[in-house]
Amino acid sequence: MSPGRTDAPPPPPLPFVDEHTILVAADVEDVWWALAEALDWAFSRPSAVRYAKLVGCADHTAGGPRPPVAGETAFPGFRTASAVPPRELTLLGRHRFSSYTWTFRLDDAEPGGGVRLRAETRATFPGPVGGLYRLLVLGTGTHAKLTRRLLTTARLLAERPWREAPGETQAEAPAEAPGESPA
């Protein structure tokens, strides 16, 4: 066996918590970029940084490339574990009360077209304090509400009738929305 290599199997996945789904009337590339924008929006607020610090997350600031790249992109409370553009993004995190993953999957919606955006949460909550934390986060519906809000934000961003192309600045963007003619 070479140094640094182990033949141990990967750890089993964390226990399933929930999955939320939303249909998006846009192509998969637009939904991928919208998901990245929605994550940036949700985790760029000072309250997200304060919360990540309060519960003891290793990652409590946003950083790295956008859209997310595995091992290089972080959000408060999360690090990007894997990214398969434009189909799957897995974020992982850990703090004093929980270890968790949040996996976003983008599937073609049949037969009407568009994209099915899914958010799957897996987590463990060790010990009595972890159990109390689970009750506070899951039992109150807070996690479900925030997940649905994030998915709705991604849908609204992806379905905008006009938006800048990735990497395009406001100065380079056309003055009118597609389909409009100047007056």
Functional labels for PLM-detected ranges:
Residues 66-68, 89-95:
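Short beta-strand segments that buttress and anchor functional surface loops
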Residues 1-61, 183:
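Hydrophobic ligand-binding cavity/cleft-lining segments
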Residues 17-19, 75-76, 98-103:
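Short, surface-exposed coil-to-beta transition loops
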Residues 31-35, 80, 119, 154:
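Hydrophobic pocket/interface hotspot
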Residues 96-148, 154:
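Beta-strand/loop substructures that line and gate deep hydrophobic ligand-binding cavities in soluble
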Residues 60-72:
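Short aromatic-glycine motifs in intrinsically disordered, low-complexity regions
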Residues 25-29, 82-86, 106-116, 156, ...:
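A short, structured loop/turn motif at beta-sheet edges
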Residues 164-168, 172-182:
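Intrinsically disordered, low-complexity segments used as extracellular stalks/linkers
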